[in-house]
Amino acid sequence: MYQTTAELRSAFLEFFRSNGHQVVDSSSLVPGNDPTLLFTNAGMNQFKDVFLGMDKRNYTRATTAQRCVRAGGKHNDLDNVGYTARHHTFFEMLGNFSFGDYFKEEAIRFGWTFLTETLKLPKERLCVTIYQTDDEAFEIWNKKIGVAAENIIRIGDNKGAAYASDNFWQMGDTGPCGPCTEIFYDHGDHIWGGRPGSPEEDGDRFIEIWNIVFMQYNRQASGEMLPLPKPSVDTGMGIERIAAIMQGVHSNYEIDIFRTLIAKAAEIIGVSDLTEKSLRVIADHIRSCAFLIADGVMPSNEGRGYVLRRIIRRAVRHGNKLGATEAFFYKLVPSLIAVMGDAAKGLAETQVIVEKALKAEEEQFARTLERGLGILDTALNELKGDTLDGETVFKLYDTYGFPMDLTADVCRERNIIVDEAGFEVAMAEQRSRAQAAGNFGADYNAALKIDAETAFTGYTELAGQAKVTAIYLNGESVTAIKAGDEAVVVLDVTPFYAESGGQVGDKGQLVANGIEFTVNDTQKYGQATGHQGVLATGSLSVGQVIEAKVDKKLRHRTQLNHSVTHLLHAALRQVLGTHVSQKGSLVDPERLRFDFSHFEGVKAAELKEVEELVNTQIRRNHELKTAEMGIDEAKEKGAMALFGEKYDSQVRVVTMGDFSIELCGGTHVGRTGDIGLFKITSEAGIAAGVRRIEAVTGAAAMAYVAQQQAELEEAAALLKGDANSVVAKLKAQLDKMKQLEKEMAQLKDKLAAAASADLVGDAVVVNGVNVLIKKLDGVEASSLRGLQDELKQKLKSAIIVLGTTQEGKVNLIAGVSNDLIGKVKAGELVAMVAAQVGGKGGGRPDMAQAGGSQPENLDAALAQVLPWITERLA
């Protein structure tokens, strides 16, 4: 009997493999082919282009165990996680797919056979739903499978519009769609809930375990449903739900995976009660966070990284709630890898960087908590009334990671009410912003769709005859264009490389007698290559034969930069470690940009070693060899793949000696020696855990070196030396500058001491306390602290407020002697003054600083200080 989650996963894939399905690896959680998705959230995502007819595979049946995330965007389960039996941010979707192969009867039979024969689920515990008008599905279930009519439930348009139904699936407002049938499991009458379609259907008794979608229509913009020429099937079964059934439990959080993670989290934090909901949250969130980082997402303040950061902080908050006093979340990664089995292969390979990224985010969260307490204290001190507004509460939560319930606890101690409704409004607005982050809601159907194929000859030639098969003007198909028209021209065959894998599209010309079309870019449109540009002369029509000519110089320079990215990737892995993987690239004729995973800045010595290693491989003049092979064979040979790229079962492998082997469909030099020279121009971080190197090659590298030499010679002339003496002379100048700065600081201290002696006489006495309020002219902000200390020593029991203006800004300092801080706090005092000069600030009870942007209001602000102090000393 299959019981563990790992056993169920293997059994499912083996069942469909034995029934003629290609087992396809789970795709990345970062969708590689769909701009409308924030994260991969269903098994069919990686096959979307196949269903749309824009991609072809060498198989018509497939099966997967797809990793999915639902957090942020349209599909967001985050708020419910930990509080229900079945909501998760991360889950695995088991699925089988037919691309114009089998249809309803086979799909239904496969599902029923796996559940009742392979898993041996009792048939009397199962019932099914179908779309209201899908009589064909009813006949199959009833007559061919043998399900009683009373156990086949018809579901109509229960969402308020035509075809808006739990049992009618639609990819979007237009495009492939169709009815679906769902299989439900009855957990028993001791669990509350009703059959699907009943008023009690939201209960936990009847649980959907398998959804089988029949894609048989193409919905038009008019709403008309046209039959698809090749109907297809998309199915999905959540592994956590079927595991709960097989393991005899009623909550997903009681299955083997979660039991292990919950127990480990409790052990690390020191919790004895394993039923704590916070432990569920932590166990769920470590799965989504770890796998997202493994797939290249890093915590940040925008897009996918923003959602990841929120999930991490939610988990850490629940850990703190349970009493965690130090970073704990990252310590769950080894247990996660162990319990996920084969599904954690990619995670195991990136374990080091995943743990470092999680730990860094946890530690940063701890620092923001401390800052949040300081911000909250200042906000409460400035509060007028008894209610802290929701926007401030949300700012503390969202910007500083400060939990709302902790804010409420602090407020209760001061008899202050928290505006929870305002907080929820601000939270809802931020959720909307997160959904829109990175424009992930773009209309997929807005892309130009071209029903054609173009053969590529550009690996071996840069010019050749071709026939025009289609022309698109302003997004519409036309038969001809005239001079001056900007259009996309499709050919039956082309030497032009279409942008892919970081390499920009080729430029060049399409020419014939009296015709010249300037190609400014080349892009892929499904299986077709689109030549984007302007018709300079003549007229061009579909069916004409032209000569396609790639710009040789631009292609050559691009190839230098592309080939060297392979060498750079291999060199980085040698120097920094095998955790380095490519996260993106840009290769054009002028330069290259290479993004890679690494948890810290690359040291100067490491950069030098990388550069030297690449240039060594260039000098060795390796021949670049390409070969077509199966994806599994390529992986066995150690070929590295590009982050976010999709690969067919047959791939192209590029090898450079024994130094580099990668999957790549781009164009390259013949030998590494053609690159000439490689020079790194910059290295920087672009996100947490992601670094970027920019570099140049060939003639551009020589020009860069020449420019550096010219700048060095110019610097030498300014220092009155030569290139060989620049460093020594510069060091001497810096030493001299440091000495002058030291002397200047000493002089300022003397001036401050002298000024303090003069200022003592300006103090007034209020109820036996020396009070000094002064606007200072010509005093730098950096001198205020020392001056305040001098005055405190001379005035003893005193309250001091000093202000100065410099470059259109106000600088303030307040000092209160220790015997008076029970009555007057420097932080409150300086904040009061700062508010009147367009600024803010705070600090300790005995000393605080602030700034402002309205120097014209400084005199009036200082005039308010004495009454303010007098009131508190009364």
Swiss-Prot record:
Residues annotated to bind Zn(2+): H562, H566, C664, H668
UniProt organism field: Shewanella baltica (strain OS185)
Classification of source organism: Bacteria, Pseudomonadati, Pseudomonadota, Gammaproteobacteria, Alteromonadales
Keywords: Aminoacyl-tRNA synthetase, ATP-binding, Cytoplasm, Ligase, Metal-binding, Nucleotide-binding, Protein biosynthesis, RNA-binding, tRNA-binding, Zinc
Gene Ontology process terms (BP): alanyl-tRNA aminoacylation; negative regulation of DNA-templated transcription
Catalytic activity, EC: 6.1.1.7
SUPFAM superfamilies the UniProt entry points to: Class II aaRS and biotin synthetases, Putative anticodon-binding domain of alanyl-tRNA synthetase (AlaRS), ThrRS/AlaRS common domain, Translation proteins
Job of this protein: Catalyzes the attachment of alanine to tRNA(Ala) in a two-step reaction: alanine is first activated by ATP to form Ala-AMP and then transferred to the acceptor end of tRNA(Ala). Also edits incorrectly charged Ser-tRNA(Ala) and Gly-tRNA(Ala) via its editing domain.
Primary gene name: alaS
Annotated family: Belongs to the class-II aminoacyl-tRNA synthetase family.
Entries under Gene3D superfamilies matching the protein: 2.40.30.130, 3.10.310.40, 3.30.54.20, 6.10.250.550, Bira Bifunctional Protein, Domain 2 (3.30.930.10), Threonyl-trna Synthetase, Chain A, domain 2 (3.30.980.10)
Protein name, entry field: Alanine--tRNA ligase
Required co-factors: Zn(2+)
Aminoacyl-tRNA synthetase listed as a keyword: yes
GO molecular function: alanine-tRNA ligase activity; aminoacyl-tRNA deacylase activity; ATP binding; tRNA binding; zinc ion binding
Subcellular location: Cytoplasm
Main location: cytoplasm
Cofactor: how and how many bound: Binds 1 zinc ion per subunit.
UniProt note: domains: Consists of three domains; the N-terminal catalytic domain, the editing domain and the C-terminal C-Ala domain. The editing domain removes incorrectly charged amino acids, while the C-Ala domain, along with tRNA(Ala), serves as a bridge to cooperatively bring together the editing and aminoacylation centers thus stimulating deacylation of misacylated tRNAs.
Keyword Metal-binding: yes
NCBIfam families membership: alaS
A matching Pfam family: DHHA1
